[in-house]
Amino acid sequence: MQILFNDQAMQCAAGQTVHELLEQLDQRQAGAALAINQQIVPREQWAQHIVQDGDQILLFQVIAGG
Protein backbone atom coordinates (compact mmCIF):
# COMPACT_ATOMS: atom_id res chain seq x y z
CA MET A 1 0.00 0.00 0.00
CA GLN A 2 1.11 3.54 -0.70
CA ILE A 3 0.88 6.09 2.14
CA LEU A 4 2.34 9.47 3.03
CA PHE A 5 4.20 9.54 6.35
CA ASN A 6 5.27 13.02 7.41
CA ASP A 7 4.92 14.12 3.76
CA GLN A 8 7.16 11.28 2.47
CA ALA A 9 5.68 8.66 0.14
CA MET A 10 6.29 5.11 1.31
CA GLN A 11 4.97 1.57 1.09
CA CYS A 12 3.50 -0.36 4.00
CA ALA A 13 1.99 -3.81 4.43
CA ALA A 14 -1.75 -4.33 4.12
CA GLY A 15 -3.43 -4.85 7.50
CA GLN A 16 -0.67 -3.04 9.39
CA THR A 17 -1.70 -1.05 12.46
CA VAL A 18 -0.45 2.43 13.27
CA HIS A 19 1.47 0.97 16.23
CA GLU A 20 3.19 -1.61 14.00
CA LEU A 21 4.08 1.06 11.43
CA LEU A 22 5.64 3.30 14.08
CA GLU A 23 7.60 0.33 15.50
CA GLN A 24 8.87 -0.53 12.00
CA LEU A 25 9.97 3.09 11.44
CA ASP A 26 11.48 3.35 14.95
CA GLN A 27 9.20 6.31 15.68
CA ARG A 28 8.14 5.54 19.27
CA GLN A 29 8.25 8.93 20.97
CA ALA A 30 6.81 10.02 24.29
CA GLY A 31 4.66 13.11 23.91
CA ALA A 32 3.97 12.50 20.22
CA ALA A 33 0.60 12.97 18.56
CA LEU A 34 -0.60 11.40 15.34
CA ALA A 35 -3.07 12.56 12.70
CA ILE A 36 -4.39 10.46 9.85
CA ASN A 37 -6.03 12.36 7.01
CA GLN A 38 -6.11 15.47 9.23
CA GLN A 39 -7.90 13.69 12.11
CA ILE A 40 -6.13 13.14 15.44
CA VAL A 41 -5.99 9.46 16.41
CA PRO A 42 -5.71 8.97 20.20
CA ARG A 43 -2.67 6.95 21.31
CA GLU A 44 -5.02 4.37 22.88
CA GLN A 45 -6.29 3.52 19.36
CA TRP A 46 -2.92 3.13 17.64
CA ALA A 47 -2.75 -0.64 18.27
CA GLN A 48 -6.20 -1.16 16.69
CA HIS A 49 -6.24 1.46 13.91
CA ILE A 50 -5.44 -0.19 10.55
CA VAL A 51 -3.50 1.91 8.04
CA GLN A 52 -5.39 2.28 4.75
CA ASP A 53 -4.03 2.74 1.22
CA GLY A 54 -3.61 6.46 0.52
CA ASP A 55 -3.57 7.53 4.19
CA GLN A 56 -1.73 10.74 4.99
CA ILE A 57 -0.09 10.24 8.38
CA LEU A 58 1.57 13.00 10.39
CA LEU A 59 3.51 12.25 13.58
CA PHE A 60 4.45 15.33 15.55
CA GLN A 61 5.72 16.36 18.96
CA VAL A 62 3.17 17.99 21.25
CA ILE A 63 4.52 21.19 22.79
CA ALA A 64 2.86 22.82 25.78
CA GLY A 65 2.77 26.57 25.88
CA GLY A 66 1.68 29.11 28.34
From Swiss-Prot:
Coiled coil: none annotated. One of its GO terms (biological process) is thiamine diphosphate biosynthetic process. One of its GO terms (molecular function) is sulfur carrier activity. InterPro entries: Beta-grasp_dom_sf, Mopterin_synth/thiamin_S_b, Thi_S, ThiS/MoaD-like. Keywords: Nucleotide-binding, Phosphoprotein, Thiamine biosynthesis, Thioester bond. It holds the Pfam family ThiS. Pathway: Cofactor biosynthesis; thiamine diphosphate biosynthesis. One of its GO terms (cellular component) is sulfurtransferase complex. C-terminal thiocarboxylation occurs in 2 steps, it is first acyl-adenylated (-COAMP) by ThiF, then thiocarboxylated (-COSH) by ThiI. The modification 1-thioglycine is found at G66. There is a cross-link at G66 (Glycyl cysteine dithioester (Gly-Cys) (interchain with C-184 in ThiF)). It comes from the Bacteria. The modification Glycyl adenylate is found at G66. Belongs to the sulfur carrier protein ThiS family. Is the sulfur donor in the synthesis of the thiazole phosphate moiety of thiamine phosphate. This is Sulfur carrier protein ThiS. It comes from Escherichia coli (strain K12). The gene is thiS.
